[in-house]
From Swiss-Prot:
This is NADH-ubiquinone oxidoreductase chain 1. It comes from Cabassous unicinctus. GO terms for cellular component: mitochondrial inner membrane. GO terms for biological process: aerobic respiration. The lineage of its organism: Eukaryota, Metazoa, Chordata, Craniata, Vertebrata. The chain crosses the membrane at residues 57-77, 88-108, 124-144, 159-179, 219-239, 241-261, 273-293. It is a multi-pass membrane protein. PROSITE patterns: COMPLEX1_ND1_1, COMPLEX1_ND1_2.
Length: 303
C-alpha cells in the first residue's frame, strides 16, 4: 500500500503533465521512477519546524493519527482475502473515516494559525456532510448484499456488477468519495489563493509528509472500496481466476479518473459544495434507499 501510495504521486504528476502538455517527471530519470524516492528522502531529512505558539502534543499527534487511520482502513478490504474478516466491515470503515475528521480538526487547531483553522473547519464540514450521503448509499448496497461483510459483495456481484442496477448511486458515491478525500474539484481546504494549503499550512518535513501520505492512501482506499462495492471487485468475465489483478486494474482505472477530474475541473465554491450535498445528494440518496428497502417488501421477498 505504501509503495502504491508513493508511486501514485508520480502517476498524478505524469497525468497532469500530459494533460497540461508540459514536461513533468515523465522526462526526468528512468520514466521518473526515482521521483517518489527522492521526495521521501527530501521530506524526511528536513528539520520539522514547529510554530512557537502551537500546542505540541496535538501538533505531533494529528499527522500520526491521520496516517495510522489511513492504513488501518485497509483491514477489512478483500483483496481477495481481507486482513481480518470483520462481520461489520462496512461499519468499521465508516467509523474510521469519521475518526479521520479529528486529525484534521486537531492539526488546524494546534497550529494556532488563522489560515490553518479556516482550512480545518472547511475540511471538517465537508467531510462530515459527505459522510451522510456515503452512509446512506452504503445502506442501499447492504440491502442488495444482505450482510455487512465486504467479502460477500464478491459473491453478490458474480452475475451482475452492482454498478448497473445502482448507477445513480454509483455516480453519487463517486462524487462523494471525491469530496470525502478532499480532492479537486472539492479541494476547498487547500484553496491556494485564499488559504495557502489549508490545515497543514504550519507543517514542514516529516509531519507534512505524513499528511500527504495519508491523503494519497485514502484516495487509493476509496477507489478500492468503490471497486469492491460497485465493480464486482475480483470478478472479470474474461479472466475470472486473476482475482488480485482484476482488483488492482479496476482500482487503478478509478484512481486515474480521480486525477483526470482534478486536471479538468475548477474548484467549487464553498456554498455550492454544501448545496450540492444537502439539497441534491441527500434527498436523492434517501429516496433511492427507501426504494431499495421497499421493493423487496412489495415484491413479497422475491430476490
Amino acid at each position: 500500500i505504501l509503495l502504491a501510495m508513493a508511486f501514485l504521486t508520480l502517476v498524478e504528476r505524469k497525468i497532469l503533465g500530459y494533460m497540461q502538455l508540459r514536461k513533468g517527471p515523465n522526462i526526468v530519470g528512468p520514466y521518473g521512477l526515482l521521483q517518489p524516492i527522492a521526495d521521501a528522502i527530501k521530506l524526511f531529512i528536513k528539520e520539522p519546524l514547529r510554530p512557537l505558539t502551537s500546542s505540541k502534543p496535538m501538533f505531533i499527534l494529528a499527522p500520526t493519527l491521520a496516517f495510522s487511520l489511513a492504513l488501518s482502513l485497509w483491514i477489512p478490504v478483500p483483496m481477495p482475502h481481507p486482513l481480518i474478516n470483520l462481520n461489520l466491515g462496512v461499519l468499521f470503515i465508516l467509523a474510521l473515516s469519521s475518526l479521520a475528521v479529528y486529525s484534521i480538526l486537531w492539526s488546524g487547531w494546534a497550529s494556532n494559525s488563522k489560515y490553518a483553522l479556516i482550512g480545518a473547519l472547511r475540511a471538517v464540514a465537508q467531510t462530515i456532510s459527505y459522510e451522510v450521503t456515503l452512509a446512506i448509499i452504503l445502506l442501499s448496497i447492504m440491502m442488495m448484499n444482505g450482510s455487512f461483510t465486504l467479502s460477500t459483495l464478491t459473491t453478490t456481484q458474480e452475475h451482475l456488477w452492482l454498478v448497473f442496477p445502482l448507477w445513480p448511486l454509483a455516480m453519487m458515491w463517486f462524487i462523494s468519495t471525491l469530496a470525502e478525500t478532499n480532492r479537486a474539484p472539492f479541494d476547498l481546504t487547500e484553496g491556494e489563493s485564499e488559504l495557502v494549503s489549508g490545515f497543514n499550512v504550519e507543517y514542514a518535513a516529516g509531519p507534512f509528509a505524513l499528511f500527504f501520505m495519508a491523503e494519497y492512501t485514502n484516495i487509493i482506499m476509496m477507489n478500492a472500496l468503490t471497486t469492491t462495492l460497485f465493480l464486482g471487485a475480483l470478478h472479470n468475465p474474461l479472466f475470472p481466476e486473476l482475482f488480485t489483478v482484476n482488483f488492482v486494474t479496476k482500482t487503478l482505472l478509478l484512481t486515474i479518473t480521480f486525477l483526470w477530474v482534478r486536471a479538468s475541473y475548477p474548484r467549487f465554491r464553498y456554498d455550492q459544495l454544501m448545496h450540492l450535498v444537502w439539497k441534491s445528494f441527500l434527498p436523492l440518496t434517501l429516496a433511492l434507499c427507501m426504494l431499495h428497502v421497499s421493493t423487496p417488501a412489495m415484491s413479497a421477498g422475491i430476490p
